[in-house]
């Protein structure tokens, strides 16, 4: 309370209640003037308005927290859905990669050699054994020979993938296609 001596007012009120003769009640009545009562009522009203504002703020905060919780749960749900979706995509991709890796070209048996002897037409040869030994023999026969090694990918009848020359030749002959050999 601003201009009111609240302690003196309290003491006068307590003494006025306990005095049988009413002498101290006169002191209380002197201290409690209409302006004091109005000031006390104004202060009480300000306190009630303050409490009401705080209650409204608390209610607004509670509503905001509730909305944020709903948004958080929605975001968590979407995140879980996306995580599951991308885990599926990763799984499918991993399976696809594994399948593609299993279909990789094996170089053994898929290599052809373009052999060029000086002054002669280049010849294409297919190595069926150890490649290094085969190359060594070619170089021993003609040290000036140049050799290009070509790895070939075979596609058989109907565009099917085949792993090596032997499988390719077998598939072609099964389809009735004759291949002129060396």
UniProtKB/Swiss-Prot annotation:
Which InterPro entries does the protein's record reference?
Answer: Ead_Ea22 (IPR025153)
**Pfam families associated with the record:** Ead_Ea22
Q: What is this protein called?
A: Protein ea22
User: What is the source species?
Assistant: Escherichia phage lambda (Bacteriophage lambda)
Encoded by which gene? ea22
